[in-house]
């Protein structure tokens, strides 16, 4: 990507975040175009894309035949097809899997590195962007297109915007916001996604979890009414037979080192510690606190105490901004 990522700063929790413009280079864009785009995606992802309007974006999962997610995709309509945003570390293998059946359909599936992904969040983010765009997305209209630019609106953990933009316009936007906004990289957006309870699937965890183990059903990412898609049988079984015993949790506290994606944690059991869970993502905030996104059993006690393996510090469960009650 020719657009240079902004230098990193220690991320800040949403409640204290000043106006911040971020380069989202740890995320990547991909597209599907052609006459069969909608039909093809409908047979591949967990969401009902046939019901998606131009004004919506959805978090959907792309699964293998066993219902395990290759990746999750932030999906929106783009031109005559769809575009989606996923972690850069999983894009290549995810596209390889998605293309496996494409020979029989009128579709073109490709990575898109021509466009740049930017995030805007923090204090008065809407006011800052209102000076630069004629219309901004909102709860009622979550996707807005202006020329070659697409803006996506997110409510959690606090109002923020993801901008899909060409390089020249990205440079112009950066110049206009440079004076009033702090600049940061993907880690700040990652911290906000962890706080929002949006599952982060990197390469280490690709092919490991069914969508419900990462709360996708609570985020509107699974349709149980649509027709067949790859992995549907296992995803449906997890719902209707209660086969899913896992959930995504948010932990916060201290740790002398950041756990990596794919690593386990330890749960305090009386005087002992027992290994548990799988870390999806973790970030250290500027106040020294650590936030960890982890998949664990869905019946954890709310006052459970955790730690990074063999660490002296502890982590505790924080509430997510959505309910898992069905």
Curated annotation (Swiss-Prot):
InterPro entries: GCV_T_N (IPR006222), GcvT/YgfZ_C (IPR029043), tRNA-modifying_YgfZ (IPR023758), YgfZ/GcvT (IPR045179), YgfZ/GcvT_CS (IPR017703), YgfZ_barrel (IPR048451). The gene is ygfZ. The lineage of its organism: Bacteria, Pseudomonadati, Pseudomonadota, Gammaproteobacteria, Enterobacterales. It holds the Pfam family YgfZ_barrel. Its main location: cytoplasm. Folate binds at residues 27, 189. It is found in: Cytoplasm. GO terms for biological process: iron-sulfur cluster assembly; RNA modification; tRNA processing. One of its GO terms (cellular component) is cytoplasm. One of its GO terms (molecular function) is folic acid binding. Folate-binding protein involved in regulating the level of ATP-DnaA and in the modification of some tRNAs. It is probably a key factor in regulatory networks that act via tRNA modification, such as initiation of chromosomal replication. It comes from Escherichia coli O127:H6 (strain E2348/69 / EPEC). Keywords: Cytoplasm, Folate-binding, tRNA processing. HAMAP family: tRNA_modifying_YgfZ. This is tRNA-modifying protein YgfZ. Belongs to the tRNA-modifying YgfZ family.
């Amino acid at each position: 990507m020719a657009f240079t990522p902004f230098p990193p700063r220690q991320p800040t929790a949403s409640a204290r975040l000043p106006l911040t413009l971020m380069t989202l280079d740890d995320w990547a864009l991909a597209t599907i175009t052609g006459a069969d785009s909608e039909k093809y995606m409908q047979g591949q992802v967990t969401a009902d894309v046939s019901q998606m309007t131009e004004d919506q974006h959805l978090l959907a999962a792309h699964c293998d035949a066993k219902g395990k997610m290759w990746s999750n995709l932030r999906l929106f309509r783009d031109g005559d097809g769809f575009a989606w945003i996923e972690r850069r570390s999983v894009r290549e293998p995810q596209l390889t899997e998605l293309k496996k059946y494409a020979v029989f359909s009128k579709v073109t599936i490709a990575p898109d590195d021509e466009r740049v992904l930017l995030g805007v969040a923090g204090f008065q983010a809407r006011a800052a962007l209102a000076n630069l765009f004629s219309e901004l997305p909102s709860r009622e209209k979550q996707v807005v297109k202006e020329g070659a630019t697409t803006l996506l609106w997110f409510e959690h953990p606090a109002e923020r915007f993801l901008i899909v933009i060409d390089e020249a316009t990205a440079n112009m936007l950066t110049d206009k916001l440079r004076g009033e906004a702090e600049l940061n990289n993907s880690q700040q957006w990652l911290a906000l996604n962890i706080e929002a309870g949006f599952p982060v699937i990197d390469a280490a965890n690709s092919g490991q979890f069914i969508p419900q183990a990462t709360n996708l059903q609570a985020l509107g990412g699974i349709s149980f009414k649509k027709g067949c898609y790859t992995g549907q049988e296992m995803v449906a079984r997890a719902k209707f037979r209660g086969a899913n015993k896992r959930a995504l949790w948010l932990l916060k506290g201290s740790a002398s080192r950041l756990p990596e994606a794919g690593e386990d944690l330890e749960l305090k059991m009386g005087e002992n510690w027992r290994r548990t869970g799988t870390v999806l993502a973790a970030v250290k905030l500027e106040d020294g606190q650590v936030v960890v996104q982890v998949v664990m059993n869905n019946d954890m006690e709310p006052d459970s105490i955790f730690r990074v393996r063999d660490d002296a510090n502890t982590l505790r469960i924080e509430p997510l901004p959505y309910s898992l009650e069905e």
